[in-house]
Amino acid sequence: SSDLDFYCYKGLTVFEMDDRAVVELDGGKYTVEQALEKGPQYAKIYISLGINELGYFNDEAFHQTFGDFLKQVKASQPGAVVYLENLVPVNAEKCAANKQPYYVNNDRVAAYNAIFPQLAEEYQVVLLDVADALTDENGILPADATVDGVHFTKAWYQKWLAYLMEHTVDADCYAAGQTAAEGANET
């Protein structure tokens, strides 16, 4: 659909939202943060970041930087419902077979997934539990759902999209929640 924009780039991390120009907009190239300021105002923003950061081994820096990014998104897109997606666990066997880096593992995914609920609460954004929706009964990505242990097959991308479309919040309720949270923070 022409009313969708994707701000994405291979290997992009939350640590680069304010300094890596990857978004083409009006003939220029901008960082994601700049594009969100200069570009259109969106009704919904979905944020899916974290797998490329697994090798940083600094959960505090991840938390802080992600929080700064969420604050910036909300400031530049005040009318948007912001959805934060957690990380889908990987398939260890397929990761090994495809020579994924050693740090791309479910212990690291779990460490970051423990941070997302804190971020959602701190910054009053909607947390989407894509991890639960896209894993098997053991909490891992099924082998037939992934091409390399991390990235999905076409069918699994479609399952992800269906989950996102089925798990939305009413924009007016979201806005009311933002206002209530601001009031609570001022007391």
Where are these regions (language model features)?
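Catalytic His-Asp segment of secreted/periplasmic serine-dependent ester chemistry enzymes
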Residues: V90-T187
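Conserved SGNH/GDSL esterase-like catalytic core that processes O-acyl groups on lipids
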Residues: S2-T65
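Loop/turn elements at helix/coil->beta-strand transitions in domains of secreted/extracellular proteins
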Residues: P40-I45, Q77-V82, Y123-V126
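Generic structural signal for well-ordered alpha-helices
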Residues: F66-L70, N113
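N-terminal cationic-hydrophobic initiation segments that often serve targeting/anchoring roles
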Residues: L36, L70-A75, A120
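Second-shell loop/turn segments in exported
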Residues: D19-A21, N52-A61, L70, K99-N106, ...
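Active-site segments of SGNH/GDSL-like serine hydrolases
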Residues: S48-N52, K74-V109
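Hydrophobic/aromatic beta-strand patches that form the interior of the parallel beta-sheet core
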Residues: D5-Y7, Y83, V126-L128
